[in-house]
Amino acid sequence: MIEKIWSGESPLWRLLLPLSWLYGLVSGAIRLCYKLKLKRAWRAPVPVVVVGNLTAGGNGKTPVVVWLVEQLQQRGIRVGVVSRGYGGKAESYPLLLSADTTTAQAGDEPVLIYQRTGAPVAVSPVRSDAVKAILAQHPDVQIIVTDDGLQHYRLARDVEIVVIDGVRRFGNGWWLPAGPMRERAGRLKSVDAVIVNGGVPRSGEIPMHLLPGQAVNLRTGTRCDVAQLEHVVAIAGIGHPPRFFATLKMCGVQPEKCVPLADHQSLNHADVSALVSAGQTLVMTEKDAVKCRAFAEENWWYLPVDAQLSGDEPAKLLAQLTSLASGH
C-alpha cells in the first residue's frame, strides 16, 4: 500500500499532505539553522564523505558504501565507516564493531560493511561520537565514510553523494509520509555526486547497476552459480525486496516462492526455517545472511551483489576523495 501511495497510484497521499507539510517545515528549518550557523556542526579532523538518500526505502546505498570503501582501500587509503546503526540496540554508544558484534547490537548494514571491507566501523545515533571512537582506536584513518546521514547536519561533511533508485526515482515528489521524500529533489543541486541505481540516468548522473556474484552457502562458504540451485524459496529483508527477486530471475532462477520481509526485521531459526519445505533451497540477500549465519541450515544460501558504476565520473570522484584523504 505504501508503495502505491508514494508513487501516486493511490489518492490516499492527499490525506497525508498536512503531515508532509509539517515534516517539510521542520526538516527545512533544521537545515537552515545549520546553513546560517545558528547551530554548529561538528567537524572531524579528517575528511567526511556522506553517502545518503533523498528518499526513504532501499536505493542501493549500502553497495555504494562498500564499493567506495574498497576502491579507496585499493588506492592505499585507510577508511573508517560510521552509521546510526538503525535496527540495532547496543548497551552503550558509540559502539566500535568487532568480529563478535551482532546485528542485534549494531544493525544489519554496519555488520555487512564490516564483514565485507574489514574497515573500522562504529555506530551511534550521534555520528560525531562514532567518528571520535574510530579515530581514538584507529588514529591512522585518513577519511570517514558515513553510511546514510545526508540529513544529519550535526556532522559537517566535505563531500555529499546521493544514491537514487533509477526506476522509482522520487515517486509523487512529496515529503514523508504522503511521499517518499526526506528532502525535495532540488537538494541534488548542492551535492557532489548523484548515483542512479538502474533505470535511465539523466544528465550529470552516474549510472550504476548491481552485479550479482555467485551464491554462497551460509554454513560452508561454498560458492556456485545461483542458477544451479533448485526449488528455490527467496526471501529479502531490504528496503525494496522486489529488486532482489528481479535479480534472481535475471540470473535464471524462477523461485517457487518469494517472501518479502520488513527492512531490518529481526530473524530467528524458527521463523526462517518455517519458510522452507523439505527439498527446497532458501536464497536470501547478503544483508539477511549476516543475521542468519549463526543458525543457518545446509540448504541456505545468499546472493551477494556489487555496485558497478559506469562512465568517467567514478574515476574523477575517486581521484577527488584520494586527494582529500592524502592530505591527512
UniProtKB/Swiss-Prot annotation:
It catalyses: a lipid A disaccharide + ATP = a lipid IVA + ADP + H(+). It is an enzyme of class 2 (transferase). It comes from the Bacteria. The keyword Coiled coil does not apply. GO terms for molecular function: ATP binding; tetraacyldisaccharide 4'-kinase activity. GO terms for cellular component: plasma membrane. GO terms for biological process: lipid A biosynthetic process; lipopolysaccharide core region biosynthetic process. The keyword Nucleotide-binding applies. Pathway: Glycolipid biosynthesis; lipid IV(A) biosynthesis; lipid IV(A) from (3R)-3-hydroxytetradecanoyl-[acyl-carrier-protein] and UDP-N-acetyl-alpha-D-glucosamine: step 6/6. InterPro entries: LpxK, P-loop_NTPase. ATP binds at residues 55-62. HAMAP family: LpxK. Belongs to the LpxK family. This is Tetraacyldisaccharide 4'-kinase.
